[in-house]
UniProtKB/Swiss-Prot annotation:
This is ORF8a protein. Residues 1-15 form the signal peptide. It holds the Pfam family bCoV_NS8. Keywords: Signal. Residues 16-39 form the SARS ORF8 Ig-like domain.
Length: 39
């Protein structure tokens, strides 16, 4: 059960990292101040 949770977290993290990298390449300021971009 724990293994499933860990695998899910890893897949989510990798997915989020991919999205963040794409956003960062398009908008460099996203990494600098993500809060302003989200709100």
């Amino acid at each position: 059960m724990k293994l499933l949770i860990v695998l899910t977290c890893i897949s989510l993290c990798s997915c989020i990292c991919t999205v963040v990298q794409r956003c960062a390449s398009n908008k460099p300021h996203v990494l600098e101040d993500p809060c302003k971009v989200q709100h």
